[in-house]
Design a protein with these regions (language model features):
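ANL superfamily adenylate-forming
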Residues: 24-51, 135-183
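Structural core segment of the AMP-binding/adenylate-forming
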Residues: 5-8, 71-72, 99-170
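Conserved structural elements of the adenylate-forming
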Residues: 59-64, 170, 202-223, 228-235
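Conserved S/T- and glycine-rich ATP-binding loop of Class I adenylate-forming
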Residues: 80, 97, 128, 186, ...
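Conserved pre-ATP/AMP-binding loop-to-beta segment of ANL
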Residues: 15-18, 170-191, 198, 221-227
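Conserved AMP-binding/adenylate-forming core of the ANL superfamily
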Residues: 8, 16-87, 91-95, 112-117, ...
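Conserved AMP-binding A3 loop
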Residues: 52-56, 187-211
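Short hydrophobic alpha-helical segments of the AMP-binding
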Residues: 90-98, 104, 209
Length: 236
């Protein structure tokens, strides 16, 4: 069972229940100022301190992104890199990639410009989705990164060398794309920490992504009544 089916199931069964919550340290809240030091939430300067989406909206956003990808030529087996801090858009983008049958490639947000280029070329990514904090690092090698790749920017004031995520998905269908995905299809590439050299790419099938989610749930014993605090970076 591909992990995307869990999202679609929850959207059907619990459409109006909250699925994701983002707390933005750029909007101070005296009850949560200790979060600021972690710098793990994508800046959203024109949004309130707290943003949230329901399961149905989560799934719709993933579908819109998936349909946008397909419309731009992304197909099963292609690779889409994600270079963003933790934010409300991160998981809908990740699941949107999976829904196309493409392979999600999360990048460590600590990568410098050369490491980004190295990993993009090593994984042979077809698209890089990045946030505001990474404009400078992407721009450093924008000419090489944009050769044969699409650069998609998530945020306000889109740089000239990229295309705007929000504009691209605005008119896309919220229905799931008609793509068959099996447990044996490849779903993600995660990179090693690179402590002994440049990071190494590790390819995962959908089956391993599903099993990881199941093991996490069993380990923590969580249920739909619980709220799971995600402090670690989502690329990990």
């Amino acid at each position: 069972m591909p992990v995307t089916e869990y999202l679609e199931r929850n959207a059907r069964l619990y459409p109006d229940e909250v699925a994701l919550v983002e707390l933005n340290p750029d909007e101070p809240d005296t009850r949560r100022t200790s979060w600021k030091e972690f710098e793990l939430i994508q800046p959203s300067r024109f949004e309130p301190y707290r943003r949230e989406i329901t399961w149905s909206v989560f799934d719709e956003k993933a579908n819109r992104f998936a349909n946008m990808l397909i419309g731009r030529g992304i197909k099963k087996g292609d690779k889409v890199a994600i270079l963003m801090y933790n934010c409300l858009e991160w998981l809908p983008i990740y699941f949107g990639v999976l829904k196309t049958g493409a392979i999600a490639v999360p990048f460590n947000f600590r990568y410098d410009a050369e490491e980004i280029l190295y990993c993009a070329e090593l994984a042979e990514v077809d698209m890089i989705v990045f946030g505001p904090a990474f404009i400078g690092r992407i721009e450093t090698n924008a000419e090489r990164l944009s050769k044969g790749r699409l650069l998609i920017y998530v945020g306000d004031n889109c740089p000239e060398f990229a295309e705007s995520y929000h504009q691209l998905v605005a008119d896309c269908s919220s229905h799931a794309p008609n793509v068959e995905i099996t447990d044996d299809d490849f779903g993600a590439i995660y990179f090693s920490s690179g402590t002994t050299g440049f990071p190494k790419a590790i390819l995962h099938k959908h089956q391993s992504l599903t099993q990881a989610a199941q093991m996490e749930q069993k380990h923590h014993g969580t249920s739909r009544d619980d709220t799971f605090l995600c402090i670690p970076p989502l690329y990990h």
